[in-house]
């Protein structure tokens, strides 16, 4: 039996096409993936992300534990509610998961991890926490709704109560605040402004219906994927996993090398990889007809004229740009043009930084 989120019946009421997503019955779309994509880029859309795993980390050693567990450094978080994105690495510097950490106070942090990696993540955390004065608490009674788009905050404001609107007023990106029963964060997975709202299961249906009434369009996994790829955001399992180090997954900016004495998991292995050199992640755009798909090969000649090869990790048709975009892991010697092999033919592509659309506009 697949898991169902607390909003399952609401999806059916909106005529969602349901699919299995890592053991969860989730909406793929509600009729038109393209319309849902454009709603988020131009207005406001919402996603049921209750399959994500919310974990609270409490105790006097919470900070010390997370400084060992994560490659980014939670000691940088000084203001309550501030959030941090980063990787949880194994001892070989492979990416176990990518996640967001919220600093609530010195003895309380909240992490949100991917659903597909839940059991693996919790087992790793349980193993690594030994010896620390920390209590790990999964919060399965909490649902999560992401409201994203240029009008998302205004439409959410019409649903929030006075205290909640006061709590989020002027809140910068990558913050979270507990406001009555809602934990409201200025985070997202679309490249647009908006909120990710953690809500008790018992209140999730009412919040979903209120947002629907406020004109927020329900959006499924299909639009979520095209939006995150346009924004150049990684999808765990496609763009990285334990076989990939963060430097080869456009996550170098999330590695806190300083202070030098912070011995985070995988540090030694990652330092050796960095010194030896590793592949990198690039963005590709293809204005010719066709769609670049994961697993396709990328070819280019390096400065010595030697042919090099890389692999597409994520690829799709970009509804915003009107042509195909992709992310690829390639040797570092790549320049600004390459070719992708499609149906035994090589098609030219442009090579850019892996970010295509932000806040509704072309980002390159």
Swiss-Prot record:
SUPFAM superfamilies: Aminomethyltransferase beta-barrel domain, Folate-binding domain. GO terms for molecular function: aminomethyltransferase activity; transaminase activity. Its EC number is 2.1.2.10. One of its GO terms (biological process) is glycine decarboxylation via glycine cleavage system. GO terms for cellular component: cytosol; glycine cleavage complex. Keywords: Aminotransferase, Transferase. Pfam families: GCV_T, GCV_T_C. The glycine cleavage system catalyzes the degradation of glycine. HAMAP family: GcvT. The glycine cleavage system is composed of four proteins: P, T, L and H. This is Aminomethyltransferase. The lineage of its organism: Bacteria, Pseudomonadati, Pseudomonadota, Gammaproteobacteria, Alteromonadales.
């Amino acid at each position: 039996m697949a898991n169902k989120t607390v909003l399952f019946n609401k999806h059916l009421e909106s005529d969602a096409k349901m699919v299995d997503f890592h053991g969860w019955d989730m909406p793929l779309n509600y009729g038109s993936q393209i319309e849902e994509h454009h709603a988020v880029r131009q207005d406001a859309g919402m996603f049921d992300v209750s399959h994500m795993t919310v974990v609270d980390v409490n105790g006097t050693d919470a900070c010390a534990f997370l400084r060992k567990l994560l490659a980014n450094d939670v000691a940088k978080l000084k203001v309550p509610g501030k959030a941090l994105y980063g990787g949880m690495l194994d001892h070989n510097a492979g990416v176990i998961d990518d996640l967001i950490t919220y600093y609530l106070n010195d003895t309380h942090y909240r992490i949100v991890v991917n659903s597909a990696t839940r059991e693996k993540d919790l087992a790793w955390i349980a193993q690594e926490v030994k010896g620390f004065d920390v209590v790990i608490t999964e919060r399965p009674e909490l649902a999560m709704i992401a409201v994203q788009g240029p009008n998302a905050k205004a439409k959410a404001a019409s649903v929030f109560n006075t205290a909640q609107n006061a709590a989020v007023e002027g809140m910068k990106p990558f913050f979270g605040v507990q406001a009555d029963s809602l934990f409201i964060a200025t985070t997202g997975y679309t490249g647009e402004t908006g909120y990710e709202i953690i809500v008790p299961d018992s209140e999730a249906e009412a919040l979903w219906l209120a947002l629907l009434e406020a004109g927020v369009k329900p959006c499924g996994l299909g639009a979520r994927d095209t939006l995150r790829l346009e924004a150049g955001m990684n999808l765990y399992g496609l763009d990285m996993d334990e076989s990939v180090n963060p430097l080869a997954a456009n996550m170098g900016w999330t590695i806190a090398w300083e202070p030098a004495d912070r011995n985070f998991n995988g540090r030694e292995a990652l330092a050796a990889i960095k010194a030896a050199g590793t592949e990198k992640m690039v963005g590709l755009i293809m204005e010719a007809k066709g769609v670049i798909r994961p697993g396709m090969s990328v070819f280019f000649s390096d400065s010595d004229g030697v042919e090099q090869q890389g692999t597409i990790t994520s690829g799709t048709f970009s509804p915003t740009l009107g042509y195909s975009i992709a992310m690829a892991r390639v040797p570092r010697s790549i320049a600004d043009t390459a070719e992708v092999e499609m149906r035994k033919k090589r098609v030219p592509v442009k090579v850019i930084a892996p970010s295509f659309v932000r806040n509704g506009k072309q980002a390159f």
